[in-house]
Amino acid sequence: MAVFTPVSLDDLTTWITQFDLGRALAIKGISSGIENSNFFITTERGEYVLTVFEKLTFEQLPFYLNLMRHLAEGGVSVPAPVANRNGSIINALHGKPASIVTKLEGHCQLAPQPVHCAAVGAMLACMHLAAEDFEIRQPNLRGLEWWNEVTPIVMPYLSDSNEQLLATEIISQNAFADSDVFRELPNGPIHADLFRNNVMFEGEQLTGFFDFYFAGCDTWLFDVAVTVNDWCIDDDSGELDQARVRAMLDAYHAIRPFTDAEQGAWQTMLRASALRFWLSRLYDFHMPRDAEMLTPHDPAHFERILRLRIAQTAPALFTTAG
């Protein structure tokens, strides 16, 4: 989240009249993240989140917003899109698509313990199952095809060591994606960006997942790998914290049991997740965009994680007793 397209209170006051939300009372930009322009807004009806989409198009957005609506209606705690009086949940603001969604209660848990990881794992499994019958299909736009597009763009900026790391791993991931094991992996809509700053807690109680704007159809295991690689690590070294990993995986497995194919693909998928975010951070770092309050991320963090996931054996997805 960031602010690329400024929206003033006067802008909001005029625009929001198409909704049954009363008068606009306040608007505040959200600085975290790097993809869209996001704002907390207060109206006579309460607090909401306004997003102006900088890259996603009117044609692409129905997948994301209707997925959120589908999950909310299915009992998964996610922000629900707010429709205007004509029933539209996507509306133009400053010539760009925009939406309003409900605001979750709580705060992000940036120092998670096993209890938090277990809650995230359980809800992630519930989310995957709830989204299984979602009818709209759209690929993960930050999946393998995008990795292949971005690799030659960022390669000239890398050291010899990192150039070799990227070249080797992209070959490995392409081969894996063409394997029988990959084709056996369960798949469907995934969040694809379930970092600590996209989950709300009140104490130890998980109150919801949000920021679904990197969602897409991919393997469920990739979603688990993304989540483990953020929630279950030592923040300085990137090494996996065994207690947090076990808590998350066991809680997920209790609701949506992992398959043998997923067990066999787990190490490779942890690497795939690290590669995806190393590439996106390299791209954003070396191809910066103008924005108010833009917060870039350090690419070296996921380079370290990728090297570790290659060098160290990952904890099993599940034990034979599970």
From Swiss-Prot:
GO terms for biological process: threonine biosynthetic process. InterPro entries: Aminoglycoside_PTrfase, Homoserine_kinase_II, Kinase-like_dom_sf, Pseudomonas-type_ThrB. Pathway: Amino-acid biosynthesis; L-threonine biosynthesis; L-threonine from L-aspartate: step 4/5. It catalyses: L-homoserine + ATP = O-phospho-L-homoserine + ADP + H(+). Its EC number is 2.7.1.39. It comes from the Bacteria. This is Homoserine kinase. The gene is thrB.
